[in-house]
Amino acid sequence: MARATLSAAPSNPRLLRVALLLLLLVAASRRAAGAPLATELRCQCLQTLQGIHLKNIQSVKVKSPGPHCAQTEVIATLKNGQKACLNPASPMVKKIIEKMLKNGKSN
């Protein structure tokens, strides 16, 4: 009975290259399929509020215009955990942002 020997290195380097290329393609396609594109390629604020009482706000995040959205977005995180989009042009929202910046509660 002849014994089969196992070699640590593959006997066909071309087969190894093809297998590695296939592995890379599969890994890249799975990453692309799992990427959250919908939230990255559009504005987060579809509707805005003119203002909200300052005592209900935990923090404020101001997102500058960019490739994902052409407008400035102001997103307030409320003390109850909800998020609310505020109108950045509203005088009340401008005052809220100033107070939050002064208190150090903005992102």
UniProtKB/Swiss-Prot annotation:
One of its GO terms (cellular component) is extracellular space. The keyword Disulfide bond applies. Its main location: secreted. The lineage of its organism: Eukaryota, Metazoa, Chordata, Craniata, Vertebrata. The N-terminal processed form GRO-beta(5-73) is produced by proteolytic cleavage after secretion from bone marrow stromal cells. Belongs to the intercrine alpha (chemokine CxC) family. One of its GO terms (molecular function) is chemokine activity. It comes from Homo sapiens (Human). Residues 1-34 form the signal peptide. It holds the Pfam family IL8. Produced by activated monocytes and neutrophils and expressed at sites of inflammation. Hematoregulatory chemokine, which, in vitro, suppresses hematopoietic progenitor cell proliferation. GRO-beta(5-73) shows a highly enhanced hematopoietic activity. Keywords: Chemotaxis, Cytokine, Disulfide bond, Inflammatory response, Pharmaceutical, Secreted, Signal. PROSITE patterns: SMALL_CYTOKINES_CXC. It is found in: Secreted. Disulfide bonds join 43-69, 45-85. This is C-X-C motif chemokine 2. GO terms for biological process: chemotaxis; immune response; inflammatory response; response to molecule of bacterial origin.
